[in-house]
Amino acid sequence: MVGTMLTMLRPQEGECTLDLYAGAGLFTAALADAVGATGTVVSIEGSPVTHKDARSNFAPDGCSRTENSADTRIEVIRGDVARHLVDLKTALEFGEIPAIDAVVLDPSREGANRTTLERLDALDPKRILYVACDPASLGRDTGILRELGWDMVQLRAFDMYPNTYHVESVALFERAPAKPRPRRRRTK
């Protein structure tokens, strides 16, 4: 999954990335490696147990720090993702964090909700990689993202739970191109 995330999202040196519903930081670690010393990764997780693991993993001497991510700015935040997206919007407006380039969104089986997706959209990231473990939730959230002006440009599915209906999906969203306004015909 990490390789798929990196291939599809294409995080670059110096970018600012978000890892939402980050758990202990599987994707955070790979993002930190990719954005390097000049990049930023903001990791948000609601579970106190996995948040504690993430804080330990990404401490300056943490086990998930590599040579390439030793100096990466990694913010590990515990709490409700939707609420913290409001805080990030404020931090952006005050220049406390750079513009957001890429987002990994890996919610629970229920998926994200409209409020979370609207608040994420307000941050104006360039790319969103949605990792979903329920196709129905991904379908619902894709509809919301489409309403907000995002296009799904790539989709991969993984049968990680053989002989069950569970499918892990990874979808890349980018801003839909602006639609030209239709020209009005002049009548004489």
What name fits each language-model region?
Residues 1-188:
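Rossmann-like S-adenosyl-L-methionine
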